[in-house]
Design a protein with these regions (language model features):
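Short alpha-helical transmembrane segments in multi-pass integral membrane proteins
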Residues: 33, 74-88, 164-188, 202-206
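Interfacial/gating helices of multi-pass transporter permease domains
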Residues: 15-37, 65, 103-109, 235-238
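Helix-loop junctions and terminal segments of transmembrane helices
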Residues: 32, 36-74, 128-133
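Interfacial transmembrane-helix starts/ends
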Residues: 30, 62-91, 108-111, 199, ...
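Membrane-interface junctions at transmembrane-helix termini in multi-pass inner-membrane proteins
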Residues: 115-146, 150, 155-156
Length: 277
């Protein structure tokens, strides 16, 4: 039941794109999906081992430890999600341009919607693990509702805005059910407390990403002269530069402001005794 939402997304999207746009656009969208799906699969595989032990953690009954681990995973996922969409946004169109040609490049609006969907799925991929750990399976209506919202919005918006409208179905359905309902349900039935602190921290992560990205834009506009569209060598060089600049800004801000990220980083590098968490 809980896989239905994702199944509908992957099976229905190409059909709806073909119906409201064209078969050619299905292929164009598929080029972007290949790159992004591989990235998402890699990231999810990195967390498989960590999130597999959540059930045992919950069984111990130490609520402080449970929430500490929850926020560590949460912060790292939001960090990775932010980093991934930043790099894809700045690199995917130049890559497609060099790989296939200018005619295969999707509009900036479509790319933003695709990346918004990617960000939501990477950053919120852990909630299900905690819900399963608590044995909270009885919101069986959720995946069915997600699938229904997805299809309805995709049909309505697709008939108006084409590809962008179809993709909005994925974003809005996932946002409402997985990003809003699931955390609320977890706090309500799992942690047995109000979810106010959760939303405060999520807004904090979003603000950190926004400020970091804006800071990079200022640097890019005034100091970076490399064009990623010239050849693969320039693309790689540009990728290295922006990864370093944004990585430093984003990492420092997450470490300074995000308690969960700071806790994970200190534990990962074994520097807890030198850093106040």
């Amino acid at each position: 039941m809980h896989k239905i939402g994702g199944l509908v997304q992957y099976q229905a999207a190409p059909i709806l794109i073909y119906s409201f746009v064209s078969l050619k656009m299905v292929a164009y969208y598929g080029n972007y999906s290949i790159v992004i799906d591989k990235v998402q699969t890699l990231i999810n595989s990195l967390f498989t081992g960590i999130e597999a032990g959540i059930g045992n953690l919950i069984a111990e009954g130490n609520q402080i430890k449970i929430e500490k681990v929850f926020w560590e995973i949460n912060s790292v996922r939001y960090y990775i999600a932010g980093f991934v969409i930043f790099l894809i946004y700045h690199l995917v169109n130049p890559f497609v341009f060099l790989w296939l040609g200018e005619e295969y490049i999707l509009s900036n609006t479509v790319v933003v919607i695709i990346l918004l969907n990617t960000y939501l799925r990477i950053s919120n991929g852990y909630n299900a693990s905690f819900l399963f750990g608590y044995g909270l399976f009885y919101d069986t209506w959720a995946p069915l509702t997600e699938a229904a919202i997805n299809i309805v919005i995709a049909i309505v918006c697709g008939s108006i805005w084409g590809l962008s409208g179809v993709l909005l179905g994925n974003v809005i359905s996932f946002l409402l059910i997985v990003c809003i309902w699931k955390p609320f349900f977890l706090y309500w039935k799992g942690f047995k407390k109000r979810s106010t602190s959760y939303w405060f921290n999520i807004l904090k992560y979003l603000a950190i990403l926004a400020v970091s990205w804006y800071s990079f834009i200022l640097i890019d506009k005034n100091f970076i002269t490399v064009s990623p569209n010239q050849n693969y060598k320039s693309l790689i060089f540009y990728a290295v530069i922006i990864t370093f600049i944004f990585g430093v800004i984003f990492s420092l801000m997450m470490f300074a402001v995000g308690k969960g990220f700071r806790s994970f980083t200190c534990r990962f590098f074994k520097i807890e005794k030198w850093i106040k968490i």
